[in-house]
């Protein structure tokens, strides 16, 4: 079973021409990495290419499971995809493995105290390890506004649907388990 300790989720509602959601990972208010999510098309080739970016049957199985899940629910638009690319700054690998679908964010972190996650369309579609200066400044601006929530109604709706709960401060907590 995996659980996620309380993590502050900030929603970026800034309009963007990019359709790829990105999670920015912060440790003590410092960017330590980002996770880029791509839509799942369900093809064997697509999944095989993704699996080659990682090692181990476990990750491969997780990606296959997530793809099957998305495929089986294609009549209901979930609006999220599978974690397919992991970009870590400074070469620090903080994700031990990848588990299924974005909103659960049920990933094991190794030796990291993650305190803030920004969910939103904040990143360009590329394979660069580092954020562009524009991306970084945009995220910094969001943090500096010192608000607990920047709602993307769709994102919030999805998170609540799969087991997150909101407290009085507008912070969503995961109560999901696997």
Regions found by a protein language model. Give the residues of each.
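Non-catalytic substrate-recognition and accessory regions of acyl/acetyltransferase enzymes
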Residues: 1-90, 104, 108-178
